[in-house]
Amino acid sequence: MSNYLEFFKICGKLKTLKRTGWVNHGVELPESVSDHMYRMAMMGMCLDKKELIGEDGKEIDKMKIIKMALVHDLGESLVGDFTPHDKITKEEKYQLEKNAIIEITNTLSGEVGKEIFDLWQEYEDCKTNEALLVKDFDKFEMILQAYEYEKQPHQLENKIKLQSFFDSTRGKFHHPLFKSLALQLESDRK
């Protein structure tokens, strides 16, 4: 039987868990992990049929990308938000988050818990059109947030510090729309 209350409490932790990259770069009032996941889900929500085509020409499942965006960082509610600069290997990060997802999904009934775990695993494996697109959401949401921080009057001194976020994503987008949006955002920064 599902323990919905426990699951909802775990999800609630993401509302107050600040994104570590912004904290480490001295951003005032940094977004939460929940904020990040919400805008990613909205990215999936607003795409129309013509944009839901993968590199292989196959249709992308819209509902799946929305759900995947909502669960991709769920494990961080128990283990925290790691950055590439943390002293932890990718494999260690993966194992910590996998164990957290298992613990979290064990609070739900088998079918629902399995769906969440499978979505998370598909995102981590990054082999499907849906996972590749949600990875693009993840990267684009980050640089869009960096852009927004740079435009805030009290953050202007952070412009050089936030350049690394843009550098880390340059040339790494798969979907044509997000390749284009990333280039447009870079142009808007000038």
Curated annotation (Swiss-Prot):
Belongs to the HDDC2 family. Coiled coil: none annotated. Binds 2 divalent metal cations. Shows activity with Mn(2+), Co(2+) and Mg(2+) but shows no activity with Zn(2+). Catalyzes the dephosphorylation of the nucleoside 5'-monophosphates deoxyadenosine monophosphate (dAMP), deoxycytidine monophosphate (dCMP), deoxyguanosine monophosphate (dGMP) and deoxythymidine monophosphate (dTMP). PROSITE patterns: HD. GO terms for molecular function: 5'-deoxynucleotidase activity; metal ion binding. It catalyses: a 2'-deoxyribonucleoside 5'-phosphate + H2O = a 2'-deoxyribonucleoside + phosphate. PANTHER family: 5'-DEOXYNUCLEOTIDASE HDDC2. A divalent metal cation 1 binds at residues 36, 72-73, 138. Its cofactor is Mn(2+); Co(2+); Mg(2+). This is 5'-deoxynucleotidase HDDC2. It comes from Dictyostelium discoideum (Social amoeba).
